[in-house]
Amino acid sequence: MSESKKPLNHLAIIMDGNGRWAKKRHLPRFVGHRHGMDNIRNIALAANKLGIKVLTLYAFSTENWARPTDEVNYLMRLPIDFFDKFMPELMENNVRVNIMGFVDELPEKTYLVTQKAMAETANNTGMVLNFAFNYGSRREITAGVQEIARKVKVGEIDIDDISEKMVSDHLLTHSLAPYEDPDLLIRTSGEERLSNFLLWQMAYTEFSFSDKLWPDFDKTDLEELVKDYQGRNRRFGKV
């Protein structure tokens, strides 16, 4: 198999455009978030059928706390509704749930439902549905570096032992090994920026940007972008 035809092991998606989707329809923003939540189910099942091993979804950033309180409170309820509604299908499709972020800062009910989802799917061996929730890449890297520094301070490791792999092993994605780094990033809604998402892990990631708003992004859109990715020549800095 040629380099360009290798499977897409880790797909990351910045799910953007829920608010604009609602605004275009003269609806409250929370309606867009609700439709966006339902679309997670559609895209997750489609990605699973494509053989993707890890699907990482940027669900809530550490910066999103600055949104209006009513909106934040609604977003904190969505994981409860999502797993209540779709857990049977996740189990049926052998999907394992992982929550990646500073989850100890979540409201108790939200935290408990995420931990329950991980526990209930822990023995599933199919695709990992990895939610980045209360996640920020700069904070993740800072926390990882601080932990390495503590180990150096107490003599657990030598400063010369610090390597790229060691840094990776101290990031929140280490549990996704050997697929910590996304092969492809998709961002919906036409925006073309990373928004503090997986900055270390995406050093060699391919990017695709869709003009579709997240609630409208469907299976066909996903398949087209995956096909485009599979036709690319990933050189990783080589000729």
Swiss-Prot record:
Q: Which free-text remark accompanies the cofactor?
A: Binds 2 magnesium ions per subunit.
Keywords of this protein's UniProt record, alphabetized?
Magnesium, Metal-binding, Transferase
Query: Which PROSITE patterns does this UniProt record tie to the protein?
Result: UPP_SYNTHASE (PS01066)
Q: Which CDD domains match?
A: Cis_IPPS
Give the enzyme class. transferase
Q: Summarize where Mg(2+) binds, as residue positions.
A: D16, E206
Pfam families recorded for this chain? Prenyltransf
The cofactors it requires, by name, are: Mg(2+)
Give the CC-aspect GO terms: cytosol
| Molecular function (Gene Ontology), one example | ditrans,polycis-undecaprenyl-diphosphate synthase [(2E,6E)-farnesyl-diphosphate specific] activity
Cite the binding residues for substrate.
Answer: 17-21, 29, 33, 61-63, 65, 67, 187, 193-195
Per the record, the similarity remark reads: Belongs to the UPP synthase family.
Cross-referenced HAMAP family: ISPT
Q: What is this protein called?
A: Isoprenyl transferase
Q: Which organism is it from?
A: Lactobacillus johnsonii (strain CNCM I-12250 / La1 / NCC 533)
